[in-house]
Amino acid sequence: MRAALLTLAFTALAAAADDATTTVGFFGGGEWENSNDDDSLPLIPSYTSIGASVVDVNAVETVLAISCLEGAATESCSINDPWTMTQGISSFSWYAEYTAFDWNPPVTATLDYNCAYENYTLSATCTYSMSYSGSSDGAETSTSFSTETSWDSVATYAALEVTGGLDKFNQPEATETPEGGAGFAGPIQAMVTAAPVLAAGLLASHASGAWRKGKILLIKPFKGILPRLARLEASVKSPNPYRNEPLTPNLDIRAPSSGQCNASLYTRHHPGCFDDDIDSLGQVVLSSQVLGVFFNRLCRVEFVCPDAQFACRECQPVFVDIHCNDVPSTKLPCCRGRKQTNRPCPKNKHILAWLELCKAEAMHRDSKGLKDNAFVKPYVVGELVAEVPRQAEKGRQRAMDNIARSRNCGKGHVRT
């Protein structure tokens, strides 16, 4: 069985023409894996010209009814019964039935998408199913597809035009928690109106004319522009999803037979922020060896775009976050762009200098525990117990000196 990567790119990009129209966001999920035995991916019958109306909103969930925009041609949008979409603080559901007349033969399709999650960016489990069938002039077609997956962190969300019921966001019920429900301060509108609007603008700036016209593409092969959009959306949604994630493989020092636990350095390359040379740092193994025992530590470099609406424009302020096990994160402010070339993003050699400090910090911390480690004691004699921490401290200081030299270019920014 070969796995095919998919992405859910739920998008309805439509400009707000007047005060009666706005754009809200909804849960888009992450990267999907096709569990079918073959590599073929079902095409999703297309539709355009849809809009939503707010049915109900409270502090726990927002319910939307989705139908065709007024005056939409039947060929682009044919919905008999409005779709129901429910965006909650811990769940999401969307059920849709429609007819796609631009297919030959025309088909009637059904989509069913349900998710449960810890919050909008963490611990999501989703099921998705789709089926369609149709016949005309002797031609017949039908298919069905379903999948289920889960993610530790969620990468995407999407935008949808809302043309009715906006006054419900301003009603007292919008901030009230239903009986038996667990709400939060303020209606879910805060989630569905702010960042997703930004994502819609980003998608419009990168995507084809069909996307800008509001065409919705549900499941497409994970290739081409879609993975770039997914990563860019992730930088808007959660600039640093690994902030609270454990950063060590936790190699058991009492079991050296487990061998060297190789820990990779992960880089997140956000379009519009960094040149491709950053990708050469994709795999770096950091390990320190003390008296034949491996002390492995995972260091991660995180490329963050906090102002993602300016991505791919003239000057993109970014941060490089360097994480190391039990070592505080280090932020390097820099700028990639034409306007402020005096504040460039760090080159590989400067990032590697920080990684050396990360490695030295881990080794120094490990070495200080040698005296009390029951496994190491039989192999440590006299001055070796003191010498290892001294050497580790020297390495730590040397790395810090290198960092000081590399950043000595004014305003604390890393020079190239």
From Swiss-Prot:
Keywords from the UniProt entry: Glycoprotein, Signal
Keyword S-adenosyl-L-methionine carried by entry: no
Signal sequence bounds: 1-16
Residues listed as glycosylation sites in the UniProt record: 119, 262
Biotech and industrial use: Notoamides have been shown to exhibit antitumoral activities. Notoamides A-C show moderate cytotoxicity against HeLa and L1210 cells with IC(50) values in the range of 22-52 mg/ml, but the IC(50) value of notoamide D is greater than 100 mg/ml. Moreover, notoamide C induces G2/M-cell cycle arrest at a concentration of 6.3 mg/ml.
Source taxon at top rank: Eukaryota
Annotated function: Part of the gene cluster that mediates the biosynthesis of notoamide, a fungal indole alkaloid that belongs to a family of natural products containing a characteristic bicyclo[2.2.2]diazaoctane core. The first step of notoamide biosynthesis involves coupling of L-proline and L-tryptophan by the bimodular NRPS notE', to produce cyclo-L-tryptophan-L-proline called brevianamide F.
Name of the protein described by the UniProt record: Notoamide biosynthesis cluster protein N'
